UniProtKB/Swiss-Prot annotation:
The lineage of its organism: Eukaryota, Metazoa, Chordata, Craniata, Vertebrata. GO terms for cellular component: extracellular region. It comes from the Eukaryota. It comes from Sus scrofa. This is Alpha-1B-glycoprotein. Glycans are attached at N23. Its main location: secreted. The gene is A1BG.
Length: 40
């Protein structure tokens, strides 16, 4: 049998609404530790 965890939750929080691309915090929430995580 193959058991798959649900995909991790991934979202970005912008520090500034006028310039959301200036300072963005990328947050990942997963049940299992992420071995290889690369930001986009």
């Amino acid at each position: 049998a193959l058991f798959l965890d649900p995909p991790p939750n991934l979202w970005a929080e912008a520090q500034s609404l006028l310039e959301p691309w200036a300072n963005v915090t990328l947050t990942s929430q997963s049940r299992l530790p992420v071995l290889n995580f690369q930001g986009l």
